[in-house]
């Protein structure tokens, strides 16, 4: 009897332990799940899922103003102002796309010249294209420098203090379209001026405009220098020598009687003419006598 009671008591204790263990396990699981959720939320706050590379967003002037006004916090925004017809803008645009992949934590916007009013460009201090503007609540920095990828990365790092999440290699330019608007490179490749004018007429016209401006600036300076040089040269000449030379020339003319020489020449010519006439008459008479003698001999 006592043994049966003891066995039942042991079974009851085992069942109670099993039920208590099974009841406490969901509590422990819920506690672990709550801690994991806190860790996940903290991780997403520090590394948001929007870090995946996104291409720059094309916006117009009104959309840019709205995005600038709605910007809050320390979030950075990089804006590219460009013109589709400009070869330098076409060279910077792929680099700007690379920057959006290397710095996904920065929002990248692109504003084309024809999609915004001139007041928008003047409001943000844009006076040349292409231009890159880095903006947040306390920063409004416009990039001044070379447009190569390494210089742009250094500008991003200095302006924001952020490091690129990845490095993208810049592709080699191929063909005339990828020549980055470099006229020297095109000429080295043997590209004719006519082909360059067909591909980028604005580049050729801008070079002609620069040459005309240089000519307009240089010509007055060169003209004044030439006048000063001519004045100094004429002032140093001894005009008295020219007077002496002219006097000697006049004296020589007076010493030589030109009229007498002309008369002598005319007399010589007339004498030669008369002598030739006499010779011609003698020659004609001799021919006539010879012809008469021949006719008389024939008649006999």
Swiss-Prot record:
One of its GO terms (cellular component) is membrane. It is found in: Membrane. Glycans are attached at residue 136. Residues 1-23 form the signal peptide. Keywords: Glycoprotein, Membrane, Signal, Transmembrane, Transmembrane helix. InterPro entries: APRL5/7 (IPR044794), Thioredoxin-like_sf (IPR036249), Thioredoxin_domain (IPR013766). SUPFAM superfamilies: Thioredoxin-like. The chain crosses the membrane at residues 202-222. Residues 41-161 form the Thioredoxin domain. It is a single-pass membrane protein. It comes from the Eukaryota. It holds the Pfam family Thioredoxin. This is 5'-adenylylsulfate reductase-like 5.
């Amino acid at each position: 009897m006592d043994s049966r009671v003891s066995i039942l008591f042991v079974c009851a204790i085992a069942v109670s332990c099993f039920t208590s263990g099974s009841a406490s396990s969901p509590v422990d699981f819920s506690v672990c799940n709550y801690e994991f959720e806190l860790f996940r939320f903290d991780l997403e706050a520090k590394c948001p899922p929007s870090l995946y590379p996104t291409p720059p967003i094309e916006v117009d002037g009104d959309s840019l103003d709205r995005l600038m006004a709605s910007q809050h916090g320390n979030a950075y925004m990089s804006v590219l102002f460009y013109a589709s017809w400009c070869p330098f803008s076409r060279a910077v645009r792929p680099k700007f796309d690379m920057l959006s992949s290397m710095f996904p934590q920065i929002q990248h916007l692109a504003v084309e010249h024809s999609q915004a009013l001139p007041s928008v460009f003047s409001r943000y201090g844009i006076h040349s294209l292409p231009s890159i503007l880095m903006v947040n609540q306390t920063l409004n920095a416009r990039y001044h420098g070379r447009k190569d990828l390494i210089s742009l990365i250094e500008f991003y790092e200095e302006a924001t203090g952020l490091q690129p999440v990845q490095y993208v290699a810049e592709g080699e330019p191929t063909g005339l379209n990828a020549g980055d608007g470099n006229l020297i490179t095109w000429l080295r490749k043997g590209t004719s001026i006519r082909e360059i004018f067909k591909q980028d007429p604005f580049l050729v016209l801008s070079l002609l405009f620069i040459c005309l401006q240089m000519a307009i600036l240089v010509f007055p300076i060169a003209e004044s220098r030439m006048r000063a040089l001519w004045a100094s040269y004429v002032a140093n000449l001894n005009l008295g020598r020219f007077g002496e030379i002219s006097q000697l020339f006049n004296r020589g003319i007076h010493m030589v009687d030109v009229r007498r020489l002309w008369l002598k020449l005319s007399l010589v010519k007339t004498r030669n003419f008369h002598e030739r006439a006499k010779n011609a008459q003698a020659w004609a008479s001799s021919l006539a006598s010879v012809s008469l003698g021949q006719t008389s001999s024939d008649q006999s």
